[in-house]
Amino acid sequence: MWSTVLVLALSVICEPVRIGLVVLMLNRRRPLLHLLTFLCGGYTMAGGVAMVTLVVLGATPLAGHFSVAEVQIGTGLIALLIAFALTTNVIGKHVRRATHARVGDDGGRVLRESVPPSGAHKLAVRARCFLQGDSLYVAGVSGLGAALPSANYMGAMAAILASGATPATQALAVVTFNVVAFTVAEVPLVSYLAAPRKTRAFMAALQSWLRSRSRRDAALLVAAGGCLMLTLGLSNL
């Protein structure tokens, strides 16, 4: 269980969205307070969802029907599938085809007509405007959003549930996952006290570096994690 929790938590650290939000908090008028509020929101969401998930699913027959090894193998296969999708860009190609409509003019030529902005685009614009606010409410909501259950998160919860450990051990595993996953915000919170400018510069450089990585770089990292999870799962069967 612990190896699965740590591997999945480490894979969350460098999420571009999470790092971008941390950089955003560091550039507020009160960066320490914003970062602390961001962390509180993240801990609240992640811890609350974890406890509800473990209590609800732990009371069902499903809890005893799978092992940690099976969770590791399943997580590894999903990671490899995601890596394949990133490499082939299947989703991106589908989205590009959907954003343009093919129509013909009087001469029979095929023209490309842009589709009006979708609801998702409008929602993204509103979210961007919301994040520009300087209220602590924005920091708290950002933390809640950053900690919304992801595939890594649910994989860790499944491993914790399948372990059959005591409630205290499961709670400790949840806390460990959250602390490791939010390292990207915890370290800047501490380092800002000693070197605010260097902290801002380092986080901005990290964000720029991640943005410069190609889709295949991300696919390679995801595939490596998937292979590691498969190896752990097969060795524990």
Curated annotation (Swiss-Prot):
Membrane topology per record: Multi-pass membrane protein
Localisation per UniProt entry: Cell inner membrane
One Pfam family per UniProt: SfLAP
Transmembrane segment boundaries: 5-25, 38-58, 66-86, 141-161, 171-191, 217-237
Keywords in alphabetical order: Cell inner membrane, Cell membrane, Cell wall biogenesis/degradation, Lipid transport, Membrane, Transmembrane, Transmembrane helix, Transport
Family: Belongs to the peptidoglycolipid addressing protein (GAP) (TC 2.A.116) family.
Protein name, UniProt field: Sulfolipid-1 exporter Sap
Gene transcribed to yield this protein: sap
